[in-house]
From Swiss-Prot:
<dbReference type="Pfam" id="PF20428">
    <property type="entry name" value="Sey1_3HB"/>
</dbReference>
<dbReference type="InterPro" id="IPR027417">
    <property type="entry name" value="P-loop_NTPase"/>
</dbReference>
<dbReference type="GO" id="GO:0016320">
    <property type="term" value="P:endoplasmic reticulum membrane fusion"/>
</dbReference>
<keyword id="KW-0342">GTP-binding</keyword>
<feature type="topological domain" description="Cytoplasmic">
    <location>
        <begin position="805"/>
        <end position="895"/>
    </location>
</feature>
<keyword id="KW-0547">Nucleotide-binding</keyword>
<keyword id="KW-0256">Endoplasmic reticulum</keyword>
<dbReference type="InterPro" id="IPR008803">
    <property type="entry name" value="RHD3/Sey1"/>
</dbReference>
<feature type="compositionally biased region" description="Polar residues">
    <location>
        <begin position="875"/>
        <end position="884"/>
    </location>
</feature>
<dbReference type="GO" id="GO:0005789">
    <property type="term" value="C:endoplasmic reticulum membrane"/>
</dbReference>
<dbReference type="GO" id="GO:0003924">
    <property type="term" value="F:GTPase activity"/>
</dbReference>
<feature type="compositionally biased region" description="Basic residues">
    <location>
        <begin position="886"/>
        <end position="895"/>
    </location>
</feature>
<keyword id="KW-1133">Transmembrane helix</keyword>
<feature type="region of interest" description="Disordered">
    <location>
        <begin position="839"/>
        <end position="895"/>
    </location>
</feature>
<protein>
    <recommendedName>
        <fullName>Protein SEY1 homolog</fullName>
        <ecNumber>3.6.5.-</ecNumber>
    </recommendedName>
</protein>
<comment type="similarity">
    <text>Belongs to the TRAFAC class dynamin-like GTPase superfamily. GB1/RHD3 GTPase family. RHD3 subfamily.</text>
</comment>
<feature type="binding site">
    <location>
        <begin position="62"/>
        <end position="69"/>
    </location>
    <ligand>
        <name>GTP</name>
    </ligand>
</feature>
Length: 895
């Protein structure tokens, strides 16, 4: 059964029809089992895929009505239409036809050897064989291959036969365009081209159709001119001399070869073939056949002998040097290959066989990729639906990874015969899309787990921002000012206006800019450390039940999901920290003022601080204002970054690396996407800090540092525009508002201190000493009365003396205050040791102290366990500050 491959108008059969035909001739049972084989028929595709490239293609060219179809029908058992001389002589084959050779004929390996031997035993066969042995010897330019080394296969590979339209026909006239197109088409697919030539026309140009040979030489030279063309892909030209009646074929074959060389020399060749012979482009073979009518008894054995050249790999003249089709096109891809080649030929495009093979590989790989991806997505959708219904799926990643490997193996199995570079490219694309589909399902599960983890870690992370800010305020509060000229004590005493005194004292202080910038860096470093501690706890193995809740068993059994949850949690915590810092920067003035109030009303150890004198308050105001200004420097640029977590990273990766890491494709993608939160400055960011001068001027904005986008790296890297939270105008505005709020708070504090003081006139104490001198001497000279007075003062006037001592600490000179405090501390320690030293009851007191210590040790573990699970939100509670209380008291007083 033959198929009209190309009609007389140059239309090629569709890919669907070609695939149906190939399925029919390769697997007739598959075609007959259904109504028709379709392109989507799985059995038909499997039959074609099973053959792969294990087939061959033979084509025939020659003059019109030269017996081409007759030769093919006898040689291969085909049913091509032949000329009916009784009706007329003219064009019979129009375009091109394709059929499969009948491998049941004698001469093919599937036939019995005895049948072949019997048919070759006649004298006529001997005569034909002698002629062809002489023809083979005369073809000195053709290299003979030792095909006998190949073992006979168990089944004969399909042999496809192409019958092309004859040349030099009346119907086409002088139009050789279609002839050239068919020649190029035949060379693009056929392993062997049979040139059908009459023996009596040897030595002639037109009668021997040497113009056809010239066309074949030119188009094959065109194919070979491409740089990526493979030199070993040379087609075989089998010149068959028909109706040969002479005894010695050598003179005729020498004439044919000379004609070939003449044509070759007359062709314009590229530089790489300038000195090459025709053997560089073709394997030349020759065969002579007796007269079809006059030597009928010799003609048929000659046909059977020639058939062995095509069907018997043990034959010395076997034409196919490889079992595979020499173009390397799998049979299931042949329809697409023929379509692409014919389209390029018909549109006068440059036909590049390697490019066509690559296009075919792309087409086939794309089909296989789409099919496997569709199958995997259908498989994954089942598990995704189960997750939507709330099921908890253990080892989900392992199931998806196994199916992914199955799909990839199926893809490689379908495309193993195509261009390896193209297959590798599409395999990478398929792997990427399969991993994306896998992670899409895993993300649905991981996000639910991450939400549970975030609900347990978010308060701690947000509290870490507050804790880092408290540490910053504590360090900034104790940061000394640079040496500078300040107001003298006399000038401060002479100031009558409290507001002017406070402003003058504040403005005179000069800040240590490098030290302040160092505090800013310590703030971000501390914040990064706090957040990474939380992330490390999330990554720890075994998973923590107080973090994962009901998912703890699932996480313990699914390492890939655990890594994915860790990535989601890390990214989410980073965004939450950034959101918190951004909100603090949006209200920078309030954040600075809160830091000022805390520094003013709390000591460096966190205890509340109260002022007894206005001078002590004025001394504390500059340090508190400096703390707020340092907070401004910390908020104007976000300095944490999400960077890729390397395999040798410590911290987060240590806990993960301590366990067996999964090696699946999805796990490698998850590990590749893993990040860690770090504080790091590039060269530009290291200089992108506010510069501080004095408290009465706003910090200087770093204008000299370049600002770039986040994707700039290397030498172009600068401060990232998205990380700048405050502009120069925003900094100045926040600073001015901060100064106003600090001045107002300082006024309230000063008024509160002034209102709380109980002052006596300066002349009262000297008057008491003068007027009560006799009474004072009487008390001093009477021991009993002196003891009574001391006891009364200690009991009833203790708070008065303590307040006076605090006032002395705040207002007294440091040269007197510090030695006095040292002496008092030493005396109190000595007195305490003397009181504890008692000979009698010492043992009893020691036992009581030991019992108290033991009781404390018993209570400590319980206290520690409670602290571990205490509500993190309690850490955000703020102790009411003194300024608020004083503000309310002042308002009531004004009312």
């Amino acid at each position: 059964m033959s198929l009209h491959l190309v009609d007389s108008d140059g239309h090629l059969q569709s890919e669907k029809r070609l695939k149906e035909y190939l399925t029919t001739i390769v697997a007739p049972s598959v075609s007959q089992s259904g109504s028709a084989a379709t392109a989507d028929d799985g059995d038909g595709d499997s039959a074609l895929e099973a053959i792969g490239v294990n087939y061959h293609v033979v084509g025939v060219f020659g003059g019109q009505s030269s017996g081409k179809s007759t030769l093919l029908n006898h040689l291969f058992g085909t049913d091509f239409q032949t000329l009916n001389e009784a009706v007329r002589r003219g064009q019979t084959t129009k375009g091109a036809f394709i059929a499969r050779a009948n491998d049941a004929l004698a001469g093919f390996e599937a036939s019995g050897a005895s049948v072949v031997a019997d048919q070759l035993a006649s004298g006529a066969a001997d005569h034909s064989s002698c002629l062809n042995r002489a023809a083979a010897a005369a073809a000195a330019a053709t290299k003979d291959a030792a095909y006998g080394e190949h073992g006979a296969p168990h089944t004969v590979p399909p042999l496809l036969v192409l019958d092309f339209e004859g040349t030099d026909g009346l119907e086409r006239g002088e139009d050789q365009c279609f002839e050239r197109q068919l020649s190029l088409f035949g060379l693009s697919i056929a392993d062997t081209l049979i040139i059908n030539m009459w023996a009596v026309d040897v030595g002639r140009f037109n009668a021997a159709n040497l113009s056809l040979l010239r066309t074949i030489f030119e188009v094959n030279l065109q194919l070979f001119s491409h740089d990526n063309y493979e030199a070993e892909e040379k087609p075989t030209l089998l010149i068959v001399l028909r109706d040969f009646t002479e005894d010695d074929p050598a003179p005729s074959l020498a004439t044919v070869r000379k004609s070939f060389d003449t044509i070759w020399e007359g062709i314009t060749r590229p530089a790489q073939f300038a000195g090459a012979s025709i053997d560089a482009l073709f394997h030349l073979k020759y065969y002579v056949m007796p007269h079809y009518k006059l030597q009928k008894t010799e003609f048929m054995p000659s046909v059977e002998t020639l058939r062995r050249w095509f069907g018997d790999s043990q034959c010395p003249d076997y034409l196919f040097s490889h079992r595979a089709m020499f173009r390397g096109v799998p049979l299931e891809g042949l329809p697409a290959y023929l379509t692409n080649c014919w389209e390029a030929i018909r549109t006068s495009k440059d036909l590049d066989i390697p490019t066509q093979r690559e296009m075919l590989a792309q087409h086939r790989c794309k089909e296989a990729k789409v099919q496997e991806l569709k199958t995997f997505r259908h498989f994954a959708r089942h598990y995704e639906d189960r997750l939507l219904h709330g099921e908890m799926l253990l080892r989900l990643s392992e199931v998806l990874d196994e199916e992914m490997e199955t799909r990839l193996a199926s893809f490689y199995r379908q495309t193993k015969l195509y261009n390896s570079d193209v297959v590798g490219q599409y395999a990478n694309e398929l792997e990427t899309e399969l991993v994306d589909a896998t992670l899409r399902v895993l993300n649905r599960l991981s996000k639910a787990i991450a939400a549970e983890v975030l609900s347990n870690t978010e308060p701690r992370v947000l509290n870490s921002v507050e804790e880092s800010l408290r540490q910053l305020l504590k360090s900034a509060q104790t940061l000394p000012f640079s040496a500078g000229e300040g107001p003298s004590a006399a000038e401060a005493e002479e100031a009558n206006d409290v507001e002017r005194d406070a402003a003058h004292l504040v403005g005179a202080q000069r800040m240590d800019s490098p030290a302040c910038q160092k505090l800013v860096r310590s703030f971000w470093r501390s914040l990064s450390s706090y957040v990474n501690e939380v992330v490390a706890e999330v990554a720890a193995m075994p998973p923590r039940a107080h973090l994962y809740g009901r998912y703890v068993a699932l996480i313990a059994q699914d390492p890939t999901t655990r890594l994915n949850v860790l990535n989601i949690v890390t990214d989410a915590l980073f965004q939450k920290v950034k959101s918190r810092v951004v909100s603090m920067a949006d209200s920078a003035c309030d954040t600075m003022h809160a830091g000022f109030e805390r520094s003013l009303t709390h000591n460096s150890d966190g205890t509340a601080r109260f002022f007894a004198t206005t001078k002590g308050l004025q001394k504390a105001v500059p340090a508190a204002m400096q703390a707020g200004v340092v907070v401004l420097g910390s908020l104007f640029y976000f300095r944490l970054k999400l960077v890729a977590a390397g395999a040798d990273d410590d911290g987060i990766g240590a806990d993960v690396a301590g366990t067996a890491l999964p090696q699946s494709r999805s796990a490698r993608r998850v590990r590749h996407d893993q990040h860690r939160i770090v504080f790091s400055d590039n060269d530009a960011e290291a200089a992108f800090y506010l510069s501080y001068s004095t408290l009465d001027t706003a910090p200087k904005y770093p204008y000299d540092v370049p600002v770039t986008s986040a994707d700039c790296e290397g030498e172009e890297a600068g401060a990232v525009a998205d990380c700048i939270l405050l502009s120069q105008q925003a900094i100045v505005r926040a600073y001015e508002l901060y100064r106003q709020k600090c001045d107002f708070t300082t006024q309230l504090q000063l008024r509160t201190v002034e209102a709380a003081k109980q002052r006596l006139p300066a002349w009262v104490i000297p008057a008491l000493f003068i007027l009560g001198w006799n009474e004072l001497l009487y008390v001093l000279t009477s021991p009993a009365l002196l003891v009574l007075v001391v006891v009364i003062c200690a009991v009833f006037f203790k708070q008065f003396f303590v307040s006076q001592w605090h006032a002395f600490e705040e207002t007294g000179p440091a040269s007197v205050v510090i030695p006095t405090k040292t002496v008092i501390h030493t005396l109190s320690t000595l007195v305490r040791s003397l009181l504890d030293y008692r000979p009698g009851p010492r043992t009893e007191r020691t036992e009581r102290s030991h019992d108290a210590a033991a009781a404390a040790e018993k209570e400590m573990p319980h206290v520690a366990a409670t602290a571990t699970h205490v509500d993190p939100t309690l850490g955000n509670a703020n102790v009411p500050t003194a300024p608020s209380t004083m503000r309310h008291r002042t308002s009531r007083k004004l009312d």
